[in-house]
């Protein structure tokens, strides 16, 4: 039994090391370091565009208006017409410097279907640009065309009611007026690659396809996209809905920019469990969603807020978020619909660390009892830590009682006392938003130190092994954890067979056997772990098949 216990400890340590490899440790909070007065430390330099409304792009020379069923390479200036899907496990390669202009009349969009790939590798000096086909003279605006949709076979927690019954969950991506096979996403392969999306700008997308709520597309929509996909250096500007939205899967990303978009900047749903580091949000006081609730972060597990697994449990770090009030000096128009810097609801469990939020109406809202339990009672499940919410935000905390949130904030180094002047960006609030900003920190900035990467959520929170490679399993979730009497073990399996589940105490003794040779099917499986007979403390749950053994940490706290 001692050997099993030591193996459990070794597995947890290995998981931590694997997860840490993604993160770039910083001393500073926010997306940018202290300036060295050279472009080298400003990762938005060269490839971002702060004035796309007035950028004259060349006229299109070729047109794509039908699905792409064979591997294809694009270059030059392309007119994108209709919904164009890359199908049949094909690869769409887009060369650096290519400009693809979306058609307004047909509400065009580009869809990368499950099994297909996009290889869009731009460079800092030759980014790939997706933009509106409208001219500067005619005027461009949010929602001129559809956007980019990447779909994969990663695990999601929500299946559509009209889908064919599968041994896994799949769904149609939201936004389209009718469902068709090319917009299905979800499966069992969280390590899948949908290609590369690097040094890319997306401008003026997010069209509403109908008058029905949630019928808008986004800048970059990711449905069930796996961690083998490379996404970095992506700017979404003037998007008519969300800049970036993740529906399940576990794709990672670095260096994301949301600039003057309409609805939410980073929206996570349906069990997404990836990681994002280095992100910039810049809002415009005159651009918000008329339907209400324009937020920086908006995160759901599932509506209503019930315990569907896997949980939405992604981790963000090093985000700089500039709200519509900027340094607090900007008066918002009476028709504005801005809300929160962070809106966590419907049983979500995302974590945000080492980040700065300035100029919002509200700061952090933890909404609903199940969501609150994830943060206030289960720090290994979800956490907000080492944040600065500037003192110009009138309501730093909403959703729970202020005293509860103050206690939470104090324990997790969430600072609500710093002014924008103390945060001290190099040029964070230019008079005109079209002016190139500089969100690096001056040497005297209070955000120049204090970041930390020791929180357990950086290693997957121990309770989530979705980011490790396993022979039998794609995803393992144990929820709730800590357990107050009963928890559910969610297992997304790669194999058919049998599974045994044991609970082991810290001495190595088996104290509970929730499953003995239980049938295991490819896809979603559930095991109830009844902890009522266990004393408060730390345990290890082992999952054993004919191919492998995995271990998850369990905390019991009645």
Where are these regions (language model features)?
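Residue-level detector of conserved, well-ordered beta-strand and adjacent loop positions
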Residues: 75, 131, 267, 466, ...
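Primarily the HKD phosphodiesterase
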Residues: 99-101
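Sec-dependent N-terminal signal peptides
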Residues: 4-13
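N-terminal signal peptide c-region/cleavage motif recognized by signal peptidases
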Residues: 14-18
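C-terminal outer-membrane/trafficking sorting elements
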Residues: 471-479, 483-558
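Extracellular beta-rich repeat passengers
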Residues: 20-75, 80-87, 91-93, 105-115, ...
